[in-house]
Amino acid sequence: MRTLQKSNVKNLIMTGCPAWYDLSKIDSLKLDKKYNDGTISDSVTIGISDPALPCNKPYFYGLVNFIVRKYHNANIKLFFHRGISKEDLAKVKLLCKKYSKLAYVDLSGSAEGFKQYNQCFLHIGFRVHAHIYNLSQGNVSVLINEDARGIGVNHALGIENIDCLLKNSKVIKPSVSNQILETIVLDYLRYIEKSGYMQYRRAYKQIREYFNVAKSFIAGMI
């Protein structure tokens, strides 16, 4: 919208993304009550989604090892959205042998499989659709952006962005080290927890407001 406004297009309405709206929850969407009683350091389940871009696989496995070490009381569930390659399967099986609380899920071809994210205390990872799904459920989700889609979602909802790619670059390639990314992620997790997940509370309010705009817009077209 900002781009269009800069081009003097004035008649604009922001209706949000339909995937934000779970019609069974949207009217009362808010931060899930599980965040009132638990913390990330408790014996919870953390879901980590895989990257879409192969060049970000080192980040993914670095993040898995980091989260397992940092939150050793937690169960870790790895979500593979487009299937698991033989190479990834071999790596994941080794990780599962090394870490008894680690498991993995193949979500390819299964929209219903997304419901497994609801078993997690939080989602962290690279998949935009995982991010959007968790937000639609009132779950805390930390997206590591691979492209502009996630950046746009977070800008619209007031959630801080964490990027792993060079901006303004024609070549897609990693731009930060694993250690730097891990530090950024840890600092953000500490921040949102200390603030009582305020960014997410505001984001859910914003989603509800966008939904009301969308309803009015659709009603005006009928």
Where are these regions (language model features)?
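Active-site anion-handling motifs in enzyme catalytic cores
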Residues: 1-222
